[in-house]
UniProtKB/Swiss-Prot annotation:
GO molecular function, one term: zinc ion binding
InterPro entries: ThiC (IPR037509), ThiC-associated_dom (IPR025747), ThiC/Bza_core_dom (IPR038521), ThiC/BzaA/B (IPR002817)
Superkingdom: Bacteria
Native organism: Burkholderia multivorans (strain ATCC 17616 / 249)
GO CC term (a single one): cytosol
Residues annotated to bind Zn(2+): 446, 510
Descriptive protein name: Phosphomethylpyrimidine synthase
Amino acid sequence: MNANPKFLSADAHVDAAAVAPLPNSRKVYVTGSQPDIRVPMREITQADTPTGFGGEKNPPIYVYDTSGPYTDPDAKIDIRAGLPALRQRWIEARGDTETLPGLSSQYGRERAADPATADLRFPGLHRNPRRARAGKNVTQMHYARQGIITPEMEFIAIRENQRRAEYLESLKASGPNGAKLAAMMGRQHPGQAFGAAAFGGNAPSEITPEFVRDEVARGRAIIPANINHPESEPMIIGRNFLVKINANIGNSAVTSSIGEEVDKMTWAIRWGGDTVMDLSTGKHIHETREWIIRNSPVPIGTVPIYQALEKVNGKAEELTWEIFRDTLIEQAEQGVDYFTIHAGVRLQYVPLTANRMTGIVSRGGSIMAKWCLAHHKESFLYEHFEEICEIMKAYDVSFSLGDGLRPGSIYDANDEAQLGELKTLGELTQIAWKHDVQVMIEGPGHVPMQLIKENMDLQLDWCKEAPFYTLGPLTTDIAPGYDHITSGIGAAMIGWFGTAMLCYVTPKEHLGLPNKDDVKEGIITYKLAAHAADLAKGHPGAQVRDNALSKARFEFRWEDQFNLGLDPDKAREFHDETLPKDSAKVAHFCSMCGPHFCSMKITQDVREFAAQQGVSEADALQKGMEVKAVEFVKSGSEIYHRQ
């Protein structure tokens, strides 16, 4: 069942689990150059260091927040009305778009007039779609190349910096040891960024709006922000920024309802999904997507060929350019921010997959391969690519050029079909850039660790540093049920090498449609991989959160340890399985080692002894050894004593 008959728009409500703030956290907003540039962040409050450890103040930590208004107690959430149109005034003020009299897509008009879908439709949209005025280009890349810094670019610069400078200043002002504390907490290991411009000796001290503009103008970063998705909070995808992650959701022909997919979206962004892809393949795709977009503060991506295939009852050979074009316009006018389009699957590459272990595993890739073979013609996506660009730039939809020939097993990694398609994607990127259309490139797949860097190096070369967006890659094929881990390993590596966004993999990969728990597991695993990549690249400020958590751990501030982690709920749950009492939250040990074998407790004891003796820690250890030596001789120099 793909549309739960119990779902009625009149009864729709937000998932209560998605709206509560995380423990000891609150939503804060940083205002930009104009009052409506209000950039959300999550402020994590910390306890003061106990007197026994120095009695220091620990100011709040600020972290990137993708949850939108859902975790803001002051926001009124009604998913039947959708989110506020945050960017609407910015879009209108540019004066290069117009409101349409109605939907342009034939299919969109048919759905709006179909009484059978009346009870499923999103009821809260009271505006018509927008499109570029004749002769205008409304992409963020076009503005960037004109030297224009948009409000979206300023928003992103503030967001990427995460108030790092303010945090260090608050440390300096925290007490007599403030300067020393700021130096310690701001310390970071040098990274290896493999030539990325934002790292190393020439790195900017902070991300500026001008830096954002320049990266977008060069094509090294994209801002997915359809003019018909004004509810979205601007974000950026590029190798010189924080590594982002995507969460896939969507119904299928056999399971899930509209309500469940909206819940998955709100759950995914709560835990850190930077973008969400709706990969629905069942009925009511149009209605499901509308509900998701209107309630999403993050960019939404789709694979339009999936819906086009539904329109021809699943028969790939009956697809036409006209049906696909209408689908693009339908989705662009709903507000989809980026389209995965498998225009690199060319007729000449299909035979190259014949000797693969797992053939063509991409759904979109297999659809286009079947069409090419059925008609023995070049793909209509490839043939009509410039026309697709014209549609994209009228709504500012970004390309996510699909890897339809990605390897589905490590056996097939880096083969001729995969790399041939990648080279074609580089050629298509140049065509899109000619139209000032934003582009990112999708990548594999299943790749053993020793072949991952080759993928990244070839992509940077052939696609001229357009952002890379990879599914993992999975580094081994032996762990069904654990592919969030097999892929998380590859994701951390390729993120370090330069991938800009990682598409999450859940434990259900290859096995079934993920539920909410699987979504969270995939998100947390990939947030971890992305952060590890930021650390390895030497992203400015990436280590601040690690330093704060390590300090909390050493000072036995258990609540702060939980709250500074990626998943406070799980950390607290694991701790409380063995030490559930409140008193354990201030204990100087955990259940791993107990009170007598805690390495950190022993270190603290050494420091206390040193302070009492008025000597250094090294001298304290030496003095302690001497005391024990005297005790040993006095006891008879016996290693063992009979009881």
